[in-house]
């Protein structure tokens, strides 16, 4: 406090103690007035200013604390969202893999059933070919047999006469008779 008083004394000439009045010299009174106002402000305003600064400091600290809490909550929500995202990505990957597996399985089943159908068609074709070959062979055999029979009949008819015919029948009847006697 002594420093403040000394600073007032050094500012300029003071009027004598016996006279009290107004100094109209603006340049002489301004520094004195300013120093008085500053002194009063410092003396009385120190507590108010200290309280204001403390309040401001507390508000800033509270704001920082609230911001830190909000930041912590945001980080926690972000981690939860990331975990949910990872879970969903994993499930999506599983669905994708399962979907591809299911598609591949269906594709293989379709290919296998197509091969089986083709194999059955090939078997039916081969059976039809064999059947047609057999039928053609039977027709050829029948035709050959008919032609051979017609030639044989033609040959027999041209070679046989009634007398030879009667002798052949008598010989066959004789053989049948002897066979009957043997069996009795």
UniProtKB/Swiss-Prot annotation:
Q: Name one GO cellular component term.
A: chloroplast thylakoid membrane
Q: Where in the cell is it found?
A: Plastid, Chloroplast thylakoid membrane
- Entry's Pfam families? ATP-synt_B
Ordered alphabetically, the record's keywords are: ATP synthesis, CF(0), Chloroplast, Hydrogen ion transport, Ion transport, Membrane, Plastid, Thylakoid, Transmembrane, Transmembrane helix, Transport
Membrane topology is:
Single-pass membrane protein
- The portions of this protein that span the membrane are 27-49
Q: Which GO terms describe its molecular function?
A: proton-transporting ATP synthase activity, rotational mechanism
- Look up keyword Transmembrane and say if it applies: yes
Principal localisation = plastid
Signal sequence, renumbered to the chain: none
Query: Looking at the keywords, is Cytoplasm present?
Result: no
Query: Which residues, by range, are in coiled-coil regions?
Result: none
Additional notes on this entry? In plastids the F-type ATPase is also known as CF(1)CF(0).
The subunit structure is:
F-type ATPases have 2 components, F(1) - the catalytic core - and F(0) - the membrane proton channel. F(1) has five subunits: alpha(3), beta(3), gamma(1), delta(1), epsilon(1). F(0) has four main subunits: a(1), b(1), b'(1) and c(10-14). The alpha and beta chains form an alternating ring which encloses part of the gamma chain. F(1) is attached to F(0) by a central stalk formed by the gamma and epsilon chains, while a peripheral stalk is formed by the delta, b and b' chains.
Q: What is known about what this protein does?
A: F(1)F(0) ATP synthase produces ATP from ADP in the presence of a proton or sodium gradient. F-type ATPases consist of two structural domains, F(1) containing the extramembraneous catalytic core and F(0) containing the membrane proton channel, linked together by a central stalk and a peripheral stalk. During catalysis, ATP synthesis in the catalytic domain of F(1) is coupled via a rotary mechanism of the central stalk subunits to proton translocation. Component of the F(0) channel, it forms part of the peripheral stalk, linking F(1) to F(0).
| UniProt xrefs under HAMAP family | ATP_synth_b_bprime
The family database entries (PANTHER family) matched by this protein are listed as: ATP SYNTHASE SUBUNIT B, CHLOROPLASTIC
Family, as annotated: Belongs to the ATPase B chain family.
Q: What is the protein named?
A: ATP synthase subunit b, chloroplastic
């Amino acid at each position: 406090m002594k420093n403040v008083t000394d600073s007032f004394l050094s500012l300029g000439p003071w009027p004598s103690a016996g006279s009290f009045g107004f100094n109209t010299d603006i340049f002489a009174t301004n520094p004195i007035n300013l120093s008085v106002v500053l002194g009063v402000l410092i003396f009385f305003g120190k507590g108010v200013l200290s309280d204001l600064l403390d309040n401001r400091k507390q508000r800033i600290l509270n704001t920082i604390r609230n911001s830190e809490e909000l930041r912590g909550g945001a980080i926690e929500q972000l981690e939860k969202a990331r975990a949910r995202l990872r879970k969903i990505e994993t499930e999506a990957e599983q669905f994708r893999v399962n979907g591809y597996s299911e598609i591949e399985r269906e594709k293989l089943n379709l290919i296998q059933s197509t091969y089986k159908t083709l194999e059955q068609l090939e078997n039916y074709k081969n059976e039809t070919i064999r059947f047609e070959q057999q039928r053609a062979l039977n027709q050829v055999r029948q035709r050959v047999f008919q032609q051979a029979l017609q030639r044989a009949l033609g040959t027999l008819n041209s070679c046989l006469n009634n007398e030879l015919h009667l002798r052949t029948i008598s010989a066959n009847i004789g053989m049948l008779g002897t066979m009957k006697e043997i069996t009795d």
